[in-house]
Amino acid sequence: MSRLSFRSTVVPSLASVILTTVTFVMAASPAQAQALLQRNISAAQAMAVVEGVLASCGRDGTRVIVTIAVVDRAGQPRLMLAGDTASPHNLDLARRKAYTARTFRRPSLEWAARTAGDSPRAGQRQLTDVIPLGGGVPIMIGDEPIGGVGVSGAVGGQPADEACAMAGVAAIADQLQ
């Protein structure tokens, strides 16, 4: 009798063998990774943004008077257009305004005010490629940035640059739902 009871405690049940095997197999197999999907501004959308800026305030007759930069969700240039009368620095200014707006998810003029003087955020101005000038506007789908647009050289300075950039984003507003 003692032999039987010893044998019954040593021989595991079929259910416990299966459970143990499944546990080891699951622990040994790598987790199933899923691709990370992120929305981004398309080339067609970037073109439409540029066309929206040009239609709103970018032309003086047949000349393009503003410089426009559209960046993607990573802040990389997607489309850039230098105005016919642009100064050499305008292209870089437009790109940096777009980058600043995209990075901080707010118009660059608003960001400039938030980081001015003795603000606790003033150190952000030391980051590479940001610029505390108006003319950059983020391109958002809800709370998710998919890009930014920056304008430089509009008649009326930075507030006009920002208004032009907003007109560019408005040109694709129906696609940002």
Segments and roles (model prediction):
Residues 32-177:
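Flexible, solvent-exposed loop/hinge segments and secondary-structure transition points
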Residues 3-5, 12-27:
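Bacterial N-terminal signal peptides
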Residues 8-12, 100-102:
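Intrinsically disordered, low-complexity segments enriched in polar/charged small residues
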